[in-house]
Regions:
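N-terminal signal peptide c-region/cleavage motif recognized by signal peptidases
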Residues: 4-6
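Transmembrane beta-barrel domains of Gram-negative outer membranes and organellar outer membranes
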Residues: 8-158, 162-265
Length: 265
């Protein structure tokens, strides 16, 4: 099983629609400073020893300019999904994030990133592969509705041969009072609940596992405290394809969009 909680809002000065959420698995397109912890509790396929399996991560993002158009992001995983014990896994870095379209209700962002072999190989939590990825992320809001789309292509450039394509989409509805046109970036109500549904398809195009296609759905519940800019999110990742990595994954994410300058100054 996989379980996740997430916390989110928008950074001070960002005028994005309040209906634009940070989905559980789908990557959001809007670029902001972000601090988030992701917890994942996994029900493994074929797990017969009864051990609790988890895969958590620290997610940090930075906005490089006042227009929220350039940014970078890093994902640092920590799990016990290997052969023995828990440790850091392979780190993912989105080196360049650029928003080609950067409007309150529509954001289209291009990504160039890398996956680095930082994991503990002896514990089965990493390998010798260095991979690069290119992606397009879309956020689209209409009143209290949100739609997100990801197109990602990743390939190993050092190590075992493998190329993967991911298609992911999310839809959500946020219960923001008084919305007639643009959902307020800073609603007057203390708490904003949202319900979401995500669909993720991961296809291995080349390599030892060529032809593998893992499809999962993720229903989710989000709660945003708009006054503090903190938010929490829960979801369950459920496989719907014959190929699957886990029986269930329970997700819990907690996070915020605090300006890094305000944190360190």
């Amino acid at each position: 099983m996989f379980f996740s909680i997430n916390s989110f809002s928008h950074e001070e000065g960002a005028n994005f629609s309040g209906a634009i959420i940070d989905p559980l698995r789908v990557h959001h397109a809007h670029i902001e400073d972000e601090q988030r912890i992701n917890f994942s509790f996994i029900d493994d396929v074929g797990n017969i020893d009864g051990n609790n399996t988890y895969s958590h991560s620290l997610e940090l993002a930075i906005n490089w300019d006042d227009n929220f158009r350039w940014g970078s992001e890093i994902f640092i995983p920590y799990s016990n999904t290997g052969r023995s014990g828990a440790d850091i896994g392979d780190i993912d870095i989105q080196l360049i994030k650029y928003a080609f379209i950067n409007e309150p209700e529509t954001i289209l962002t291009g990504i160039f990133g890398m996956s680095l072999p930082t994991g503990n190989k002896s514990k089965g939590l990493g390998g010798e592969n260095t991979a690069i990825e290119a992606a397009l992320f879309l956020d689209k809001a209409y009143k209290n509705w949100y739609w997100g789309l990801n197109l990602e292509l990743g390939t190993v450039v050092s190590g075992e041969n493998e190329t993967e394509f991911e298609l992911a989409t999310a839809v959500s509805y946020s219960f923001i009072d008084g919305t007639t046109d643009l959902a307020s970036p800073k609603p007057q109500q203390n708490f904003v609940p949202s319900v979401s549904f995500e669909l993720v398809s991961e296809n291995i195009l080349s390599g030892a596992e060529k032809g593998t296609n893992v499809v999962t759905v993720i229903p989710g519940l989000h709660l945003w405290h708009s006054k503090s800019d903190w938010s929490i999110r829960f979801g369950v990742e459920i496989p719907v394809s014959s190929d699957k990595e886990n029986d269930r994954v329970y997700l819990l994410q907690i996070g915020t969009h605090k300006d890094w300058g305000g944190i360190f100054n």
